[in-house]
């Protein structure tokens, strides 16, 4: 029996406002616990909230970028529940009348085809506080309480974990590109909950869904969905019934575990917040927001392919990060060689970033340095092999390529007479290999080139070395 997954994502995105959603407290991350609080975000009696206009603007901006329609009249509601990190015993959110609705994201499938993932709604809400656990007990930090969020709710259009990850990657790149969030999953400014059920292929009815929480990376999302898919299938195959519940991803044991039974909307007793007026949005305001949105990632990807003629795969990776795309364009302006910039970014530079667990914006050398570095190779001042050592030195020290080349004497040797003498010595010292080459073992050419490069410490121009060796062997 073949099963398929039915997956929808609820993505919570912290907005990059300087102050909280309903008060003037700072949203700065990492401050001393309970220092960015006031009577409003602590829910003290008599304190009245006032909606931050920037929150509405950022929510609209996200909605427009994600192809949503904007509700011209929306309101704030109270979601009632008791938990220690919720000081008011209710959360200010939007239920019946969200800010945005009916959007979509287009993702690329593994076979190269495009697929639309529809977005049901985007609504504004405030974040809760944060629980801190240590050996002395559990403490609550309310600095995060009242920080503005948008929740982006997809329809259950995804059929496997890879589609879900692709959707989240695309969503993150859009939100970062338009400047509404830094989307740092490790800091919790982008959090994702997944709803997943399974059904037999061909069946139109949805199965019983479970919600999964505590996934703070793309890898965790993929692993959690794969595990839950297999778990639910196993339950059904054994004659059981999947129970609607909330589960969390246990990273240490690579499995989902039960948190609580799943609540329905009725359990939260939503009703309008009487302390906040309805939000009226004019056509002019919508147009202003539209005009403020720059180039979106999919538009940038299309332009890069046409303008720079670099491979689609490279373009997709480079444009998925605003910082990487900007680094690429600035380096290309200097070097006038987009293909080389792409190759170095996708190759050695990405390897060094991953090895040192840092991002492109934290790199020590500038895009201008990369452009100058590529010009040194293109002008034959240094060789490609020297370039690999040079880029690592730039990465570690932040020094300019010209300074390192001068300090270490790395200038490429293009002197044909000097190279000829070294070639003659290599061939003279390896008579058996020369005979083998002439008898048909042509792969030995690489050995001879390697010996010359070893003697010259990689400084000899490899093109000239190849030409001279071939000429000498064929005499």
Swiss-Prot record:
PROSITE patterns: GATB (PS01234). It is an enzyme of class 6 (ligase). It comes from the Bacteria. It catalyses: L-glutamyl-tRNA(Gln) + L-glutamine + ATP + H2O = L-glutaminyl-tRNA(Gln) + L-glutamate + ADP + phosphate + H(+); L-aspartyl-tRNA(Asn) + L-glutamine + ATP + H2O = L-asparaginyl-tRNA(Asn) + L-glutamate + ADP + phosphate + 2 H(+). GO terms for biological process: glutaminyl-tRNAGln biosynthesis via transamidation; translation. SMART domains: GatB_Yqey. Keywords: ATP-binding, Ligase, Nucleotide-binding, Protein biosynthesis. Its EC number is 6.3.5.-. Pfam families: GatB_N, GatB_Yqey. One of its GO terms (molecular function) is asparaginyl-tRNA synthase (glutamine-hydrolyzing) activity. Heterotrimer of A, B and C subunits. Allows the formation of correctly charged Asn-tRNA(Asn) or Gln-tRNA(Gln) through the transamidation of misacylated Asp-tRNA(Asn) or Glu-tRNA(Gln) in organisms which lack either or both of asparaginyl-tRNA or glutaminyl-tRNA synthetases. The reaction takes place in the presence of glutamine and ATP through an activated phospho-Asp-tRNA(Asn) or phospho-Glu-tRNA(Gln). NCBIfam families: gatB, PRK05477.1-2, PRK05477.1-4. Belongs to the GatB/GatE family. GatB subfamily. PANTHER family: GLUTAMYL-TRNA GLN AMIDOTRANSFERASE SUBUNIT B MITOCHONDRIAL AND PROKARYOTIC PET112-RELATED, GLUTAMYL-TRNA(GLN) AMIDOTRANSFERASE SUBUNIT B, MITOCHONDRIAL. This is Aspartyl/glutamyl-tRNA(Asn/Gln) amidotransferase subunit B.
